[in-house]
Amino acid sequence: MTGMRGLSVFISDVRNCQNKEAERLRVDKELGNIRTCFKNEKVLTPYKKKKYVWKMLYIHMLGYDVDFGHMEAVSLISAPKYPEKQVGYIVTSCLLNENHDFLKLAINTVRNDIIGRNETFQCLALTLVGNIGGRDFAESLAPDVQKLLISSSCRPLVRKKAALCLLRLFRKNPDAVNVDGWADRMAQLLDERDLGVLTSSTSLLVALVSNNHEAYSSCLPKCVKILERLARNQDVPQEYTYYGIPSPWLQVKAMRALQYFPTIEDPSTRKALFEVLQRILMGTDVVKNVNKNNASHAVLFEALSLVMHLDAEKEMMSQCVALLGKFISVREPNIRYLGLENMTRMLMVTDVQDIIKKHQSQIITSLKDPDISIRRRALDLLYGMCDVSNAKDIVEELLQYLSTAEFSMREELSLKAAILAEKFAPDLSWYVDVILQLIDKAGDFVSDDIWFRVVQFVTNNEDLQPYAASKAREYLDKIAIHETMVKVSAYILGEYGHLLARQPGCSASELFSILHEKLPTISTPTIPILLSTYAKLLMHAQPPDPELQKKVWAVFKKYESCIDVEIQQRAVEYFELSKKGPAFMDVLAEMPKFPERQSSLIKKAENVEDTADQSAIKLRAQQQPSNAMVLADQQPVNGAPPPLKVPILSGSTDPESVARSLSHPNGTLSNIDPQTPSPDLLSDLLGPLAIEAPPGAVSNEQHGPVGAEGVPDEVDGSAIVPVEEQTNTVELIGNIAERFHALCLKDSGVLYEDPHIQIGIKAEWRGHHGRLVLFMGNKNTSPLTSVQALILPPAHLRLDLSPVPDTIPPRAQVQSPLEVMNIRPSRDVAVLDFSYKFGANVVSAKLRIPATLNKFLQPLQLTSEEFFPQWRAISGPPLKLQEVVRGVRPLALPEMANLFNSFHVTICPGLDPNPNNLVASTTFYSESTGAILCLARIETDPADRTQLRMTVGTGDPTLTFELKEFIKEQLITVPMGSRALVPAAGPAPPVAQPPSPAALADDPGAMLAGLL
C-alpha cells in the first residue's frame, strides 16, 4: 500500500467525517467512482485495480456492503507479480466465503501456486485455502497439500501452513482427504524438530484421531515423546517459550490427541506419560501474572482431563482433587470456574466421590458467587456429588438458595432439588416436606411432573397419607399460596382429608371452606381438580352434612353452564352422582395405586442445555455407562405390582402354555404371589402421572416381573428357561431383554440391575478381537458375598474373564475385564452365569453377553466403481443368498438406513438407480477367515413396507447365511405367540433361592444344557 496516495486520501477523508451520515456519503461516492472505473477496463491498469480493491476492503472493514468488484479481486490472484497477487489473495479471503461461485474460478490458479516452486506464492495460496476453502477446494487440492506437507524440500514455514490447510480441508470434506496409509506419515511428522510444523501437525492429528483413532495408534507414543520433550524443556527455541512455559499450545494439543485413544497398553509409554503428568500437576501454581496463569492452567486442566481418561492410580486422582479443591477457593473467577467444571468431570471417576465431599462447604460457598456461570457449575457439582450421606445438607442448601436465585436458574434448581429429594430421601415424610417447600418457594418454576410425583408417593404409601394431608392443610392456612400448592393440597385433601376428621379445623365442611376461598384466585385448569375435591369431601362427610351438600351443589350448579367443556362435564356429572347415595361412594372410591414408570424428570435434567464443545471428554461421557447407581436401601413404597413367581419348568414343559397360564385373555399378567407388594422407592425416578385416571391394572410393559422376563415381551419370547425350585423372588429393575438388545447396537450401558447390584458393560472392538469390562456396583450399605461369575461360551468365541472378587464392599464398584476372540461367523451368544449372596438368599442370573455378530463388522463405504465389480464377482448360492422377507417392521428408508448403520453395515447412497432400494457394505473379521467383504442389497416396496427382498453376498457361505439371518432378525418383529425357543436366546431370570450346597456345586455344563 506504500505510495498509494488515493487510498491514503480516502482513508483520511473517512476519518475526518463529523458524523455517520457524512461518512456514508463519502463511502457511497467512492463506491460509485470504483464501479465506474471497473467498467472502463481499457484504462484500468494493474496499479489502479490494486488500489481500488484495497479501497473496497477498507469499506468492507467499515461495515458497508460491497456487492461488486469480486471478480476484479479474484482476477488479481492470477497476476504474475507478488504485489498484485498478494492483494488478490488478501481481499478475496476477506470479501468471499467458501460457497461463493467466483471462488471456483480461482481453483486452478491456486493449485498452480501450491504446486509451483515459489514459496511465497505457496504461502499465499495455502493461507487462502486454510481460511475459506470448502468442499470444492478439498476435492481438487487435498492431494497436492498432502504432498507439500510431507515434502522434505519445503521450508518449515510452508509445511506448517500446509498442515493447517489440510486440517481445514479435512473438516470440510473428510472423504476428499485420502488418509489411507497416512498414519505412518503422521507418525513421521510428529518426529519433526521444528515446533511450528509440530504444532500444526498435532492440530491435524487431533482432527484425524477424533474421526478414527484406531488407524493412528502408532502416533500415541510419539505424542508422549513430545510431552516428555516439552516437560524437560529440551530443544525448545525461545520464541516458543511463553512466560517460561515451553510451547503450552503444543502441550495441550498433544494431551488432547491422547484422550481420543482408549488405553495405553505399553507399560513404558504409560509410565513415561504419568511422569510427565505428575510433573505438570506438581509444578503448577497460581501466580500474579495473568498471561502465565492462563497458559499454565490451560496445560494443567488438559492434564487433569487426561488423568481422568487414563483411570490413573487413586493416589494421582486424589492429588488432582486436592488441586481442584485449591483452585475453587482462589480469587480468580476463571480458575474457580474451571476448577468446578473439572471437579464435576471427576465425579465420573470411580473412588473419588468421597474425596470430593471434603470440599462440600467451599462448593456451597461458590453457589453464592456473584458470577452466574460459577453458580451454575457449583449447582451441577452439588447435584452430581449428592448421595445418601449428604443429601439432606445439599437439598436444604438448594432450598435456601432458591429464594435468592436468578429466575433463569430456578427451574433447573427446582428440578434438581426434586430429583435429589426423591432419590436419596432418608424417609418419605422428609421428601414430602421438601417438595411442598419447593412448591411454596418457587411455584412458578415447579413443573407439573414434580407435584404429580409427590401425589404418586402419597397414594402408594398408606402410612404417609395422614402426614401429607396434615401438611397440605397447614399450607392452606397461608394468606397467599401458589396455584400449584392449591392443586396438590386439593388433591391430597380430597383423597385423604377424611383421615384428619378428628383434628380441629379438618372436618369436611371446614376443608371445603378453606379450599373454596382459593377458588377466585386460580386459573381455569385448576378448577376441575377443586370440583373433584369438593365431590370427595361431600362423599367422606360422616354423618352426612346437609349444609355442606347445599354449598357443594351450589358450586356444581354454577359451573354446569361453564364454557370450558371439562369443567362443565365434571360439574354436571358430580351433581348427578351426588344424588345417588351409596352409588356415589362406589364411583368416587379411593384412587388405585400408581405404577412406577420411567423418569420424566431425569430426562428433563439430562436435556438441560450444555454449551460445552464436543471434546473428547464429552464424547466419552456419552458412551460410558453411568457410575451413579440408584440407591436401594430406602424405605419401600407400596402399590406397584408384586413380583411374579415362575412355576417350576420340567424339560417337557411348554413355555407358551406357561405364558398362557400367567396371562388373562386381555394380556395382563395374573398376580400369582399374594404377598404385599413392595418395590424399591428409589429404583428409577419419576414417570408422567395421569392423576385423573391411574390404571387399575399394570401391564408387563411397565414392569418386568422377575421370573417372567420375556414371557409377555414380543422382543424376546425365550427368556423363560428351566430353573431350580424357588421360594422367593428378587425384583428386576428394567427389562433384561431390552437392555441386551440395546447393547447389541452400542458399546456401553447397563446389562442387568436389581435392588442390590448393577452390572454395566463398556466394550471396545478391533477386528476380530474385543475387550469388554464388566462394572459390578454394590448399591447397598451391606457387602455382597459369594460373588461368582462364569462364562458359558459358544463354539465360535474364545473368551477369557478375569477373576471376580468374592466380595463387593458396600457402595463400591469392581471391574472385571473380558477378552473376546471371534473364531468364525455365528449368531450364537455367550452367557454370563452370575450369582451372589445377599443376607440369607443367593441370587443368580444368566445373562447374554452382547458379543454378537455385528460387533465384528467394520463400516466400509464403497463407491460405484468399487462396489459393482465386487458384487458381480460373487457368484450365486451359497456365497450370494436372496430371500423375500415378510413381516418387516414398517420403516421409512432413512430409518432403515440408520438401523443398518447402527449395526455397522454402511449404506452406500446413490449406487442403486431405484430410489426405493438400499445398497450396503461392511467388512467382517474372524480369526479363521480374516477380513471378508460383505455386500447387501435391500429392495423395498413403497406400497407395502412390511415386506422386502434382501440379497446378501460374501466370500464365505457360512458368513453369508449368518449375516442374512442377522439382518432379517433386526428387521422383523416376530409375534410372541408364534415364537419358539431359540438356543441361548434369552437370559434366565434372576432367582433368589435359599443357599443350597447342591445348587452351589452345579456343573457349568449342566447349567448350559438347562439353558439350551
Swiss-Prot record:
For this protein, the record's InterPro entries field holds: Adaptor_Complx_Large_Subunit (IPR050840), AP2_complex_asu (IPR017104), ARM-like (IPR011989), ARM-type_fold (IPR016024), Clathrin/coatomer_adapt-like_N (IPR002553), Clathrin_a-adaptin_app_sub_C (IPR003164), Clathrin_a/b/g-adaptin_app_Ig (IPR008152), Clathrin_app_Ig-like_sf (IPR013041)
HEAT repeat intervals: 254-289, 354-391, 393-430, 525-565
Compartments where found: Membrane, Coated pit
Q: Which Gene3D superfamilies match?
A: 2.60.40.1230, Leucine-rich Repeat Variant, TATA-Binding Protein
Q: Does the keyword Repeat apply?
A: yes
Alphabetically, the GO molecular function entries are: clathrin adaptor activity; lipid binding
In this chain the GAE domain maps to 742-841
Residue segments, region Disordered: 652-678
What ranges does the record list as Polar residues composition bias? Answer: 663-675
Q: Name one GO biological process term.
A: intracellular protein transport
Indicate the quaternary assembly: Adaptor protein complex 2 (AP-2) is a heterotetramer composed of two large adaptins (alpha-type and beta-type subunits), a medium adaptin (mu-type subunit) and a small adaptin (sigma-type subunit). Binds to EPSIN2.
Role description: Subunit of the adaptor protein complex 2 (AP-2). Adaptor protein complexes function in protein transport via transport vesicles in different membrane traffic pathways. Adaptor protein complexes are vesicle coat components and appear to be involved in cargo selection and vesicle formation. AP-2 is involved in clathrin-dependent endocytosis in which cargo proteins are incorporated into vesicles surrounded by clathrin (clathrin-coated vesicles, CCVs) which are destined for fusion with the early endosome. The complex binds polyphosphoinositides.
Where's it mainly located?
membrane
Q: Which domain of life is it from?
A: Eukaryota
GO cellular component terms given for this protein: AP-2 adaptor complex; plastid
**What name does UniProt use for this protein?**
AP-2 complex subunit alpha-1
Keyword tags: Coated pit, Endocytosis, Lipid-binding, Membrane, Protein transport, Repeat, Transport
Write down the membrane topology: Peripheral membrane protein
UniProt lists the family membership as follows:
Belongs to the adaptor complexes large subunit family.
Please give the organism. Arabidopsis thaliana
